[in-house]
Amino acid sequence: MKIEKITGREILDSRGNPTVEVDVVLESGIMGRASVPSGASTGEHEALELRDGDKHRYGGKGVQKAVENVNKVIAPHLIGMSALDQIGIDHAMLALDGTKTKAKLGANAILGVSLAVAKAAANYLDIPLYRYIGGTNTYVLPVPMMNIINGGSHSDAPIAFQEFMIRPVGASSFKEGLRMGAEVFHALKKVLKDRGLSTAVGDEGGFAPNLEGTEDALNSILAAIKAAGYEPGKDVMIGMDCASSEFYHDGIYDYTKFEGEKGKKRTADEQIDYLEKLINEYPIDSIEDGMSENDWEGWKKLTQRIGDRCQLVGDDLFVTNVDFLAKGIEKGCANSILIKVNQIGSLTETLNAIEMAHRHGYTTVTSHRSGETEDATIADIAVATNSGQIKTGSLSRSDRMAKYNQLLRIEEELGDRAVYGYKRIVVKG
């Protein structure tokens, strides 16, 4: 099970931007391959994604430096190590980098190797990746949080909030939940078409129509849920990603950045009032990044106000980092953490963040990025950690479907042991 060869290469992601792919080959000839996702809206404390900066090549977004770090720096250091020593390998790469944000080697280089090693090890043992990562107590299939309307940085629509998601909580299995989501997605397409609105899809496969604002988006989703034959608030709940850091400046939540002149400018208290109003009026049970990553006081107030009846997910706030999560736990900010492997940059650190969250009663949501590949590792991570929730886009684009289809396979493999995740989730007040 010793590592014999590590090869990094530059491939393209779902947005046509370069990203890193890594092959790890063991002495036995068994291989693991992983590719790395990339975000559009990024938290300022995320691990560094190393880009070349050469404007004459892919507009500066090339990843040849990161690939070179895989092939010339990381590979010689890891060859000969056991692929089964995931923690040892990840720690060796962190020591080799030596920076807090992985700025020297690049989180994209380190993560590619980290995930490829795990896949090679699982293949060597001839067990599924979710079983290798999570052990025998892995049987919870996640509730999908499907981003069916895009706003903010993910579209050109005049809506400040970045994502409007459906959560098929009333399903009895992942397979049924996926079907419900697909039916609502197609019903929404008709709702939008009937209004003469665009049904082109954004980065994550959701629609990005020229709606009039947040309430218009929510009402359109309600209409689609009903048109698909489901009951909002019972069969299907709604989740939002406000991505508030994107329009927070000098203590003000400035909606005009995305909504133009009709957009409001809200103080932290007014932002909290507005979010509370929305969950009172709509079947919303999950809000991500409702406050800015730098507004810890606002986060604390929001959690005190609505944390007992709504999942409050920290994405930019926590960046999958145990240091920021520990601060949030101590201050009473949020009650859930979004898990993005490339925010922190190694499998070991990702699992550490999930473990800390669960230990302190926080829920976890395993998540994709807006720039994805056909790699479905996050589906296995969601099951491996009994996360109970996954965010991996809408019901279109094969880079998103790859994850959903992998979850269908896992559920089939688990058979009667499979539990659909929402039953396991208790929102912490």
Curated annotation (Swiss-Prot):
Mg(2+) binds at D241, E288, D315. It is an enzyme of class 4 (lyase). One of its GO terms (cellular component) is extracellular region. One of its GO terms (biological process) is glycolytic process. Binds a second Mg(2+) ion via substrate during catalysis. Pathway: Carbohydrate degradation; glycolysis; pyruvate from D-glyceraldehyde 3-phosphate: step 4/5. Keywords: Cytoplasm, Glycolysis, Lyase, Magnesium, Metal-binding, Secreted. The active site is at E204 (proton donor), K340 (proton acceptor). It comes from the Bacteria. GO terms for molecular function: magnesium ion binding; phosphopyruvate hydratase activity. InterPro entries: Enolase, Enolase-like_C_sf, Enolase-like_N, Enolase_C, Enolase_CS, Enolase_N. Its cofactor is Mg(2+). (2R)-2-phosphoglycerate binds at Q162, K340, R369, S370, K391. It catalyses: (2R)-2-phosphoglycerate = phosphoenolpyruvate + H2O. Belongs to the enolase family. Catalyzes the reversible conversion of 2-phosphoglycerate (2-PG) into phosphoenolpyruvate (PEP). It is essential for the degradation of carbohydrates via glycolysis. This is Enolase. It comes from Bacteroides fragilis (strain ATCC 25285 / DSM 2151 / CCUG 4856 / JCM 11019 / LMG 10263 / NCTC 9343 / Onslow / VPI 2553 / EN-2).
